[in-house]
């Protein structure tokens, strides 16, 4: 069965998606170089689909780039078709020449290409076709050759001569030099939730909580801040370029970099427009460093095993499948920003299918959004399609877009895009083996993903690091022991960046972030959204607390309080003598769609509200019905208007005619508080009257996270624990 978008998915399709499901707009499929004839010549090539599927077959560039030279020599694909036989003969001659003059010929070719960068367009199967991402039968053009891999190692070592194995490198200590007995002890502690916590203050009024497995050993010391890239264990190829784009770390960044590059889990709940690009560059640098070190280790061990064939070497350096990094993002344009960060940090001579990527993933901003808030334009600007997935493959000189998942190093996807490929339409074929060896998982803009369908996030994480159903050409003699023992999820690093933290995100932190190296949660200290109201006159903001015994019963307790204590006064104020309409302009803001349906149905059927006229706008209301409801509300024909948080998230309407605001629950996003209350001032002539009507919000102790952002960290404690009353007013 197809994975539903659900009540959390983006319901509006009018903006964004260029190319629908991400199909290219550059015409039919281009001819691909067929490797079957080459395989006949090189009969020693690996069999059983191992090429390009196993991590052990890491690309050696020499054969690949011979093909690249032929494919990039002409921009006209038709001309390439007409001259098929000639390039093939040339290719064989080059292969034979490479065998006769093995090292020198390839070295010369490397020098010739070092001064130029090329984009190669090789049309791969569509990344959203049913089978394209996961097919093992379609091996890519870059078949790996073990002899060529040996040369790639030699050249790579010359290229990165300063990169030596460092026992203090977190990559070594966390993935390679693992004490199996200590790992098992830590896993047992984590399984029983035996976390020991340390609290710390970061510059800028940020709170940090570090949790690590309490194994009874020495006390864990908080790492010192990192003040520059020189303190990080970076591959030399990255360090040479990163300094051009990542300046000296600021106070907050310097405190978090040691955890990110130390392979500890991180939940960062203070993502903003000003720091989002900095953290994006940092985690892109981190995952690139991880990919390059993983590839370098495999290549060196390949070379070692070839040079010492008689030795019984224990070379444990791989996972079950090649993909090592998963980056989950809300939109295609967000994916473009991440890819741009990657490409500016990793200087590749060639980028295959780059134009196709930008054609299908990027779009111009809507010029009519000049009056929209900055956070809205950042999230929905450009291509806001939330159905996508993309594989990136890295070789020594090339970045390859739209690589098949089992051939990819990094997978970038939306939750829905991943869910669609994991669960096929017929419900019979499931494939998530490509997630079995993920070692770094990144979730960016988690707050935006909450407004899609968070169930897809939970589903994806529940399928990370499972034992694969098929071998996919894996060399099990090279697989790390903690993969074979099913312990990979305790080694995986997870990084989550969000503008704020919700119970759902906290649940992800508790249930899916099991890193034996520890995990860190960072939250800001809030002053309160009630202090930042965009009105020229003071507005009375009242908070009414109701009792709720458990989160499960909270919806029922909230509804009961609303109908008994709030709705009765609303009905009285909205009707005059004889039941005639008297007052209008009440906006009822409802965060949850399920609560919206419940309240709407009650207002439509209850005898208590038979004289109350109202309109309703939700994320599923048609554009025509939205316009009608807004018109009737502004004219006074409707006394009340129901309005959901997700509607405001996706549309940011400016509702006119509001004279009073009732919050059925406070919004998750604190920015929405000021915007909703700001509706009271959209009609200047009635601003003073609207200010008198003010705002009334309902809350319970289970709304603590939301309330902290609205009223401020210092005020929250008294409001939750106050015994003398349940009503709190601020002006």
From Swiss-Prot:
Residues 58-80, 126-169 have a biased composition (Acidic residues). GO terms for cellular component: nucleolus; small-subunit processome. Residues 86-102 have a biased composition (Polar residues). Pfam families: Utp25_C, UTP25_NTPase-like. Keywords: Nucleus, Ribonucleoprotein, Ribosome biogenesis, rRNA processing. It is found in: Nucleus, Nucleolus. It comes from the Eukaryota. Residues 31-46, 112-125 have a biased composition (Basic and acidic residues). GO terms for molecular function: rRNA binding; U3 snoRNA binding. Residues 18-30 have a biased composition (Basic residues). Residues 1-174 are annotated as: Disordered. Component of the ribosomal small subunit (SSU) processome composed of at least 40 protein subunits and snoRNA U3. Belongs to the UTP25 family. DEAD-box RNA helicase-like protein required for pre-18S rRNA processing, specifically at sites A0, A1, and A2. PANTHER family: ORF PROTEIN-RELATED, U3 SMALL NUCLEOLAR RNA-ASSOCIATED PROTEIN 25 HOMOLOG. This is U3 small nucleolar RNA-associated protein 25. It comes from Ajellomyces dermatitidis (strain ER-3 / ATCC MYA-2586).
């Amino acid at each position: 069965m197809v994975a539903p978008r659900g009540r959390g998915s983006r319901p509006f399709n009018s903006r964004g998606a260029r190319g629908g499901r991400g199909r290219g707009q550059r015409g039919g499929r281009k001819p691909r170089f067929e490797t079957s004839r080459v395989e006949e010549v090189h009969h020693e090539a690996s069999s059983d689909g191992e090429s390009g599927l196993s991590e052990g077959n890491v690309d050696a560039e020499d054969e690949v780039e011979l093909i690249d030279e032929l494919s990039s020599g002409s921009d006209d694909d038709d001309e390439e078709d007409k001259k098929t036989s000639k390039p093939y003969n040339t290719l064989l001659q080059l292969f034979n020449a490479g065998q006769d003059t093995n090292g020198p010929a390839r070295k010369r070719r490397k020098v010739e290409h070092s001064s130029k960068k090329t984009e190669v367009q090789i049309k791969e199967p569509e990344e959203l076709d049913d089978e394209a991402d996961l097919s093992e039968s379609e091996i890519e053009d870059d078949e790996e050759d073990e002899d060529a891999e040996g040369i790639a190692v030699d050249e790579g070592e010359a290229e990165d001569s300063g990169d030596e194995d460092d026992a203090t490198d977190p990559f070594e200590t966390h993935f390679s030099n693992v004490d199996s007995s200590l790992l098992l002890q830590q896993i047992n502690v984590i399984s029983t939730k035996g976390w020991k916590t340390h609290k710390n203050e970061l510059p800028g009024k940020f709170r940090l909580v570090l949790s690590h497995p309490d194994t009874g050993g020495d006390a864990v010391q908080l790492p010192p801040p990192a003040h520059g890239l020189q303190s990080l264990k970076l591959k030399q190829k990255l360090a040479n370029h990163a300094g051009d784009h990542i300046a000296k770390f600021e106070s907050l960044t310097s405190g978090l970099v040691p955890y990110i590059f130390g392979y500890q889990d991180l939940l960062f709940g203070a993502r903003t427009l000003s720091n989002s690009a900095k953290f994006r560059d940092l985690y892109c640098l981190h995952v690139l460093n991880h990919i390059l070190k993983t590839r370098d280790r495999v290549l060196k061990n390949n070379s070692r095993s070839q040079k010492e064939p008689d030795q019984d070497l224990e070379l444990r350096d791989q996972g079950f499948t090649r993909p090592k990094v998963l980056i989950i993002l809300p939109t295609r344009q967000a994916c473009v920003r991440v890819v741009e960060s990657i490409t500016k940090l990793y200087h590749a001579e060639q980028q295959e299918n780059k134009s196709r990527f930008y054609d299908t993933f990027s779009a111009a901003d809507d010029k009519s959004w000049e009056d929209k808030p900055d956070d809205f334009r950042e999230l929905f600007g450009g291509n806001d399609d939330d159905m996508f997935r993309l594989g990136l493959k890295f070789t020594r000189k090339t970045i390859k877009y739209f690589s098949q998942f089992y051939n990819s190093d990094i997978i970038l996807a939306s939750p829905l895009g991943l869910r669609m490929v994991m669960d096929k339409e017929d419900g019979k074929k499931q494939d998530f083996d490509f997630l079995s060896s993920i070692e770094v998982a990144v979730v960016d803009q988690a707050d935006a993903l909450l407004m899609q369908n968070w169930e897809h996030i939970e589903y994806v994480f529940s399928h990370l690091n499972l034992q694969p159903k098929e071998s996919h050409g894996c060399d099990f003699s090279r697989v790390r022991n903690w993969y074979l023992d099913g312990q990979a999820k305790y080694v995986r690093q997870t990084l989550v960046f969000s503008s704020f933290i919700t119970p759902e995100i906290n649940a992800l932190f508790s249930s899916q972030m099991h890193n034996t190296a520890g995990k860190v949660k960072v939250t800001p200290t809030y002053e309160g959204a009630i202090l930042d109201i965009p009105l020229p006159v003071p507005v009375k903001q009242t908070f009414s607390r109701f009792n709720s015994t458990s989160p499960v019963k909270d919806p029922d307790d909230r509804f009961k309080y609303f109908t008994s204590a709030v709705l009765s006064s609303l009905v009285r104020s909205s009707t005059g003598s004889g039941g005639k309409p008297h007052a209008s302009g009440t906006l009822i803001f409802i965060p949850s769609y399920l609560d919206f349906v419940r309240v709407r149905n009650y207002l439509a059927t209850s005898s208590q509200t038979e004289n109350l006229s109202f309109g309703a706008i939700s994320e599923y209301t048609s554009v025509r019905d939205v316009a009608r409801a807004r018109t009737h509300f502004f004219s006074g024909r409707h006394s009340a208007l129901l309005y959901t948080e997700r509607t405001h998230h996706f549309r940011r309407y400016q509702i006119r005619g509001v004279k009073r605001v009732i919050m059925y629950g406070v919004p998750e996003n604190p920015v929405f508080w000021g915007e909703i209350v700001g509706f009271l001032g959209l009609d200047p002539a009635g601003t003073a009257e609207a200010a008198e009507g003010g705002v009334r919000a309902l809350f319970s102790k289970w709304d603590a996270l939301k309330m902290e952002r609205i009223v401020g960290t210092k005020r929250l404690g008294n409001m939750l624990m106050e015994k003398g009353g349940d009503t709190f007013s601020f002006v």
